Amino acid sequence: MKLHLVNDEKIINRTIDIFEEVFPGENLFVVTNRTGAFKWVSKRNNVLSRSEFQKSKSDYTFSELYIHLLNRRKMDIINTLSLHNVAVYWIIWGLDLYNKLLVPKGFQIFAPTNSSCRQERKPWNLLGLLKRIQQRHEAEDTISFVKDKVDYIVTDTTDNDYSYLLKYYPELKDKIWKDFFYYPLDVILGPELIKSTVNGTNLMIGNSASATNNHEYVIDILSKLDIGNRRVIVPLSYSGKKKYVESVVRLGKELLGKNFEPLLDFVPLSEYNKMQVSVSVALFGNWRQEAIGNIIVALYLGAKVFLSPVNPVYEWARSHGLVVYELERISQQDIDTPLEDIVKLRNREILSSLYTKERMIRLIKDLVE
């Protein structure tokens, strides 16, 4: 039996389906959120809440344990289990690596202009200081857990996450790396987008209201260019704090005027897809691995994608031959000139070869071989 510790996230239903397709009847998924009710994960016979699992765990024998995003709750569960002859896999999601482990060691995820963290960075802010001390202690505990309990480090899409982990924590160099991804390209795109290409000249900033999008940083860069009457679409309807969203909207209106178009409410998928197809320039201010699905969609559709070179995704994309551009060096010509057709085709071909269902199944099988 293969035990999967997961969060209550949309992606997990697809994860259940694909692991069951590869290993039918061999998987048990435990949703580790605090409550027993699930918002996104569909209840099935092989899906348990945390409390249900705690009551029945003695009924199961496991050969593998998969941690889909490492956090304290999952570590607590694992610490109650016997791991004799159990192979333990940590599948990195991004937050668990960059925010929780690399930031306490000095990795920067926020641009200096990011309003969400200006206050706590002030030297006299005791709360900010205490938070940083706590983060360091939590990181030390997590690394100790990984050293003692984890056998394999698994990266989702961006394989250089593993090298970043070892750069900051060389004591984990004996942990074996495995490759993996959650979604094949046809699922990422959906039936509408897989047949589409860019047909507009709009711009898009980021993928959510998460402060790690560094929206204000991107808006400031973009404000120095002449964007004419093009729309600057900024998705802000989920995954962010109210004060941060308000700050982004305020600055966007101030610097970009009527061109600035924040998406503050849920947009139906068909309408959002039309927006994505209208975007010829996609700007991502993230300094950590994030928004990879949105980046893949933009590249597939034929948009020019701009990333900060401090973002590990920039390095990853270029290592696979994908054409991406440096955000900090964006020019007027860059936004006025569409991506060449030969480059659009090449990006699409690379993504189509990387993210096939067949390759995903092979990687899942390779996890245990």
Give a label for each model feature:
Residues E246-F266:
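Nucleotide-activated donor-binding/catalytic signature segment of Leloir-type glycosyltransferases, i.e.
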Residues G94-Q135:
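Acceptor-binding helix/loop patch of EC 2.4 sugar-transfer enzymes
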Residues D334-E369:
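A charged, aromatic-enriched C-terminal amphipathic alpha-helix characteristic of glycosyltransferases
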Residues L193-N213, L222, V232-V234, S352-S353:
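Conserved donor-binding/catalytic core segment of Leloir-type glycosyltransferases
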Residues K274-W287:
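Acidic donor-binding loop of glycosyltransferase active sites
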Residues L130-I176:
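A short, active-site helix/loop in glycosyltransferases that binds the activated sugar's phosphate group
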Residues K10-R14, S210-K224:
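A conserved mid-protein helix/loop that constitutes part of the nucleotide-sugar donor-binding site
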Residues S56-K74, A87-W93:
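Short N-terminal targeting/anchoring amphipathic segment
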